[in-house]
């Protein structure tokens, strides 16, 4: 998926030898909706930009969301200092995946602290990709105009189109 950077790979089970199969365990996708500030977390994978690294820290906020093309996702900020090239999974103390490390959403002063997209938000995307289904594509980046924003900016409440991707169905339909 181009928006999230998630790729689902599959390998036929009959091509995996028994020794390797015994080393494989399933990553349990947890519920990230109840994650709060102060929750302990592990960043595993390559949070330092190199494979097989693990870092520990705390969730510093779960109150942010990001707008991407055709989706909005809740993100966690952490106090885990990693690499701007870092990636991997954010794991809770029960060993469950609660987020996928993403880049580009840290605040200006915290460029190397890790952020992660909430796994609960990504489960539908993972399920669609796992079932070899296409992710619907419209080509819009939108934001919600709340009552407060509408009053402050003297604009109607609803949805505001921030960006229309070139050559997208949204552009073909004439949306601006």
Predicted features by range, described:
Residues 1-45, 49-52, 80, 84, ...:
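Conserved active-site neighborhood of the chymotrypsin/trypsin-like protease fold
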Residues 97-156:
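C-terminal cap/linker of serine protease catalytic domains
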Residues 27, 31, 37-71, 106-109, ...:
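Flexible, gly/ser-rich surface segments that form the specificity/activation loops bordering the active-site cleft
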């Amino acid at each position: 998926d181009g928006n999230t950077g998630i790729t689902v790979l599959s390998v036929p089970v009959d091509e995996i030898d028994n020794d390797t199969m015994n080393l494989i365990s399933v990553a349990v996708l947890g519920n990230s909706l109840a994650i709060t500030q102060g929750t302990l977390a592990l960043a595993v994978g390559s949070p330092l930009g190199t494979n097989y690294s693990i870092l520990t820290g705390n969730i510093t906020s779960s109150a942010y969301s990001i707008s991407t093309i055709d989706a909005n996702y809740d993100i966690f900020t952490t106090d885990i200092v990693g690499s701007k090239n870092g990636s991997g999974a954010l794991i809770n103390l029960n060993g469950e995946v609660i987020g996928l490390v993403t880049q580009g959403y840290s605040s200006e002063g915290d460029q190397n602290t890790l952020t992660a997209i909430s796994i609960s938000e990504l489960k539908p995307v993972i399920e669609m990709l796992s079932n070899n289904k296409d992710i619907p594509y419209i080509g819009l980046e939108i934001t919600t105009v709340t009552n407060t924003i509408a009053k402050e900016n003297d604009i109607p409440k609803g949805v505001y189109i921030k960006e229309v991707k070139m050559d997208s169905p949204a552009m073909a339909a004439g949306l601006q």
